[in-house]
Each structure stands twice: as C-alpha cells, then as structure tokens.
C-alpha cells in the first residue's frame, strides 16, 4: 500500500497510530454514534462537518491516510490527513481549530521526540508527517514538524523546554526555502536574548542583544525530502 511504498514498517504505523479514513460520507459518523456519541460531539471534535444546506453532517476525512496529532504529553488533539486520490483537494487536510486542536501550538511528533531532544540537546524541524515518522523509524528520534506551516512563537517556546539547539531541515524547493527563511525570522524574534556590553568602533559603550539559541539550517539534496534522504542513506542524514 501507499505507506509501505513510502518505506514504513507495520510496527512504525502502529507506534504512531497511523490509520485510514474510508471513502464513505458517513462511515465515521455511524461508527461513533453507535458508541453513544452525538453528531454535536463529532462536530466539536472536528471529525464531521455540518452541511451548509439542508441540515445534517458528513465525514470530514474520506479516503485519506490519517496521522494522529498529539499534545506534548501524548493526549490526542486532532488529525492530519493526506489524500490518496491525486485529484482530491487539498493534498493535506487537518482538523479544524477547536478547543482541542490549535495547530500553531502543536508540533507533530513532539510527544515521541521530547526525550531524545533533551538527551541530544538538539531538535530537528522538518516539514511533513512522513519527514518525522521515517527518521524516527530509522533511529533519529529528535525530529518534529510544524505540519507544513511556518514556525510560530508558541511552537518555538515548546521546543525551548527541551533544547535551544535547533536545526531547520525543510524541503529543498522554493516553498521550503521560504519556510526556512520564515523559521529563521521567527526564531530571531522569539528566542531569548541577553544584553551584553561592548564597545563600538568609536570606543563608546553599547548594548548588544545576543540570541540565546543555536539555530542552524541544513541543506537537503535537490528534489529530495527528509524521509527520502533517510531511507536512501541514514549516514547522509546523520
């Protein structure tokens, strides 16, 4: 299947809870209502969508690979869903903003990566879900993702709890380059600075703000995503 072709092992899929949303318009609805949940419960959880006309609801995720997104402590927050049919839009569909799911305050994989980030004193930021899962499978467990969006201050503050050494390993395309530049700018604006005294060329005392973090950018081979690099040659990623 798709995930096996992308290099995932069954135990990895199980570890990350990766699943599949069937193509039906009410499969999720029927499954959870049979367990006692109401349509309102499912709307609030972001699993179904209210119809704009005629009333009723329908499944949000259909014929997609589902990546559970968890809070830092492992608690479920929402889903990221990748299309299997290339004609479906959008390519990636996330849970909507809810009380449980605030995308800008979550990092995919942090629940699994936080111990390794602290132990290695280094966090690697990648773009997509597979870019997290494949490195973890191959033993590189300090990798997280902002889920395709630009880094936010809240996400960087999350990482600061575990390490201030951050590597940006975003896709080697135009969009990835822009995301890298945005990430560097957010890091520059967000991470702590200390005021140091120094002398300018005229011998006058001045204050300098020095970033209290080590933020670096790694260059990926052209046309390759992080998961592809890891599968081709783990030593190259290391």
What are these regions (language model features)?
Residues 11-24, 217-218:
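Terminal amphipathic helices with adjacent charged low-complexity linkers/tails
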Residues 139-143, 183-188, 230-237:
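Short secondary-structure boundary/capping segments
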Residues 148, 160, 169-173, 181-183, ...:
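Toprim catalytic domain recognition across nucleic-acid enzymes
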Residues 194-238:
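C-terminal or mid-to-C-terminal helical accessory/interaction module adjacent to the motor/catalytic core
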Residues 22-166, 180, 190:
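Phosphate-handling DNA/RNA-contact segment within nucleic-acid enzymes
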Residues 156-159, 185, 189, 217, ...:
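Flexible glycine/proline-rich, aromatic-decorated loop/lid segments
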């Amino acid at each position: 299947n798709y995930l096996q072709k992308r290099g995932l092992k069954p135990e990895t899929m199980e570890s990350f809870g990766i699943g599949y949303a069937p193509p039906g318009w009410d499969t999720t609805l029927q499954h959870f209502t049979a367990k006692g949940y109401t349509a309102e419960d499912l709307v609030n959880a972001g699993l179904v969508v209210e119809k704009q006309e005629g009333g009723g609801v329908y499944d949000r995720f259909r014929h997609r690979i589902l990546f559970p997104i968890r809070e830092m402590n492992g608690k479920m927050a929402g889903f990221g869903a990748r299309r299997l049919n290339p004609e479906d839009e959008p390519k990636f569909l996330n849970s909507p903003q809810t009380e449980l799911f605030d995308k800008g305050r979550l990092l995919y994989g942090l629940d699994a990566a936080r111990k390794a980030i602290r132990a290695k004193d280094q966090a690697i930021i990648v773009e997509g879900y597979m870019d997290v899962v494949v490195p973890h499978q191959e033993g590189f467990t300090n990798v997280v993702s902002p889920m395709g969006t630009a880094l936010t201050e809240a996400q960087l503050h999350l990482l600061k709890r575990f390490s201030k050494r951050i590597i940006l390993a975003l896709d080697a395309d135009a969009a990835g380059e822009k995301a890298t530049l945005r990430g560097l700018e957010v890091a520059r604006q967000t991470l702590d600075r200390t005021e140091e005294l120094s002398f300018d060329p005229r011998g006058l005392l001045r204050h300098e703000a020095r970033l209290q973090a080590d933020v670096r950018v790694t260059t990926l081979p052209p046309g390759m995503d992080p998961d592809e690099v890891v599968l081709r040659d783990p030593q190259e990623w290391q």
